[in-house]
Design a protein with these regions (language model features):
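N-terminal leader regions that mediate targeting or early regulatory function
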Residues: 1-103, 107-117, 141, 145-149, ...
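Glycine- and acidic-residue-rich phosphate-binding/metal-coordinating active-site segment common to enzymes
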Residues: 123, 130-175
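Well-ordered alpha-helical scaffold segments within catalytic/enzyme domains
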Residues: 123-134, 183-193
Length: 315
C-alpha cells in the first residue's frame, strides 16, 4: 500500500480529476442533446445501464436485511452487457469493460461507495487514453457536466432501486452515504456564485435544491441528502456537508479535492479493490508482493463468462 501511495498511478488519477474539476468551472449540467457526439454515446450507455434495473426490480415484500438480492442478478446482466456498451463507444477492450462493470457497486456485498465512483473516473481516463473522448470533450466541461452528471443520476437510480448499502459509510461525518466527486465538481460549477445554501441558526436549507439540480451537481446531491434525511435539520443529519455553506465555492472545491486524495486514494480499504492493467499500470515491482491486478482481471473475466452462460449468451 505504501508503494501505491507514492505511485505514478495515484498521481495520474489526481491529475485527471484536477483537470476534470478545472473544466467545469462556472458551467451548468449538460443535456444529452447538447453534448458532443462521443459524450452523447457515453451518456446513452449510462441510460441503458439505468434502464436495465427495470428487468430486475425487487419483489414487493421480499425478505431482506440489507440490499435487495436482485442486485446480484442485475449486476450479472451489467457484466454481460458492458462489452457491447464499450463496443458502441468505438472500442473492443476487455479492461475498459471490466472498469465500467466495477463502477456501480459490489455484487457480493450489495453496496456502493467512493471506490466504485473512483472506478468510473479511471474508466473515463481509459476512454481518454483510447481516444474515445478528446481533449476538447474533457476541457470543454462536457465529460463532467454531461457524462459524469449522468453517471451520478444512474447511480442514484441503482441505489434507490436495490437499496444498496453504503460502502464504508461514515454516517453523519460524510458528505452523503455514497458520493464525493459530484460535490467537488458541483462546487466548481458554482465557483463565482454567492456561497451559502443553509441557515446557520436553524440548520435548514435556504435554497430549493431540487429546483437548482440542473444548475449544478452539488444541488442535485444536496437534494438527495435532504430527501434521505427527512425532517432532520441538515446541520444535524450531515454536519460536514452543512459546514460547506460557510465557505466560498472555490474554497470548498480545494478542500474536497484534497479530501478525495486523502480519504479515497489514501485509504487501503478503498484502493485495494482497484484494477490495474494497460490503462492504469502498477508502476512498482509486483514481484515484491501478490500480483493482484492480473488476478482481479481474471476474476472479472470469469464473472463475465458465468453471467454470459446464465443469460445464454455465447453458449
Amino acid at each position: 500500500f505504501e508503494k501505491w501511495k507514492a505511485s505514478a498511478a495515484r498521481r495520474e488519477i489526481v491529475a485527471f480529476v484536477t483537470r476534470l474539476n478545472n473544466s467545469c468551472v462556472n458551467k451548468p449540467n449538460l443535456t444529452i442533446d447538447a453534448a458532443p457526439p462521443q459524450v452523447r454515446k457515453l451518456m446513452d450507455a449510462l441510460r441503458q445501464i439505468a434502464k436495465g434495473c427495470d428487468q430486475y426490480l425487487p419483489k414487493p415484500g421480499e425478505a431482506r436485511r440489507y440490499g435487495s438480492p436482485m442486485f446480484r442478478d442485475w449486476h450479472a446482466w451489467l457484466v454481460s452487457s458492458t462489452p457491447g456498451l464499450v463496443s458502441s463507444l468505438g472500442a473492443d477492450n476487455a479492461e475498459l469493460s471490466a472498469r465500467l462493470a466495477a463502477s456501480f457497486g459490489d455484487r457480493t456485498r450489495i453496496d456502493y461507495g467512493t471506490g466504485h465512483e473512483c472506478a468510473f473516473v479511471v474508466f473515463l481516463l481509459g476512454c481518454f487514453k483510447l481516444q474515445l473522448i478528446t481533449d476538447g470533450d474533457v476541457d470543454s466541461g462536457a465529460v463532467v457536466c454531461g457524462c459524469f452528471a449522468e453517471y451520478v443520476r444512474t447511480c442514484r437510480i441503482i441505489q434507490r432501486c436495490f437499496g444498496l448499502e453504503p460502502a464504508g459509510s461514515k454516517g453523519v461525518w460524510a458528505l452523503d452515504d455514497y458520493q464525493l466527486l459530484p460535490f467537488l465538481f458541483g462546487c466548481s460549477q458554482l465557483s463565482d456564485e454567492e456561497h451559502g445554501f443553509g441557515d446557520e441558526d436553524t440548520g435548514l436549507l435556504t435554497v430549493n435544491a431540487s429546483a437548482l439540480a440542473q444548475r449544478s451537481m452539488f444541488y442535485e446531491c444536496l437534494a438527495f441528502v435532504d430527501e434521505s434525511t427527512g425532517s432532520t435539520p441538515l446541520d444535524v443529519a450531515a454536519p460536514i456537508l452543512f459546514n460547506l455553506t460557510m465557505q466560498p465555492w472555490r474554497t470548498n472545491a480545494r478542500r474536497l479535492l484534497r479530501l478525495f486524495d486523502e480519504e479515497v486514494l489514501g485509504q487501503k480499504p478503498v484502493v485495494q479493490h482497484m484494477l490495474f492493467g494497460e490503462l492504469l499500470r502498477a508502476d512498482w515491482d509486483v514481484s515484491e508482493g501478490p500480483s493482484e491486478e492480473s488476478e482481479r482481471l481474471a476474476r472479472m473475466k470469469a464473472v463475465m463468462d458465468a453471467a454470459n452462460r446464465k443469460l445464454g449468451i455465447g453458449s
